[in-house]
Amino acid sequence: MKQTTMTLAGTALALTLALQAPAFGHGDAAESDDTIQALISQVRRATAAFQDVQVARAAGYEQFLSCVDQPGQGAMGIHYLNGTLVADAVLDPLRPEALMYQPKKNGQLELVGVEYIVFQDAWDALHPQPPVLFGHPSHLVRSPNRYGVPAFYELHLWVWEHNRNGIFNDWNPKVRCP
């Protein structure tokens, strides 16, 4: 019982730090911070089952976009979104709104990262500042945009595929679209 209480308290503290920590820049500086690494490990554990896209579907994630790429910068992969999580105006580090998969030559999908998404209007109605996760500020994607949705804040986290441009960078040069 004591161990469970300590684990829950540690998780709660880590999540609080994830949401309130000061902002870091892109790249390795953020990746080397012990607290950030501990949080990223928690995200990996929380999303490990979603390496099987059928498990992700059963959990409410549905394909939203085909493979998204940006010539010269890399790709994000195929996005699977959980509509309930996108609509709730809450950012929970252990419950990402989107999962990103890279299509493989054999037709399989490989989980490469997660994305946190909240619509700007919903967030701004409740908060005076844009969201910060893992000590990193989110990006505002204005409308109109290539996705055809209202303005939203987003933050990518490459927890399953190393990104030499930084773990929070939108584009990963190692991810490819067919």
Model regions: which residues?
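Bacterial N-terminal signal peptides
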Residues: 9-20
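Primary mode marks residue(s) on the alpha4-beta5-alpha5 output face of response regulator receiver
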Residues: 24-178
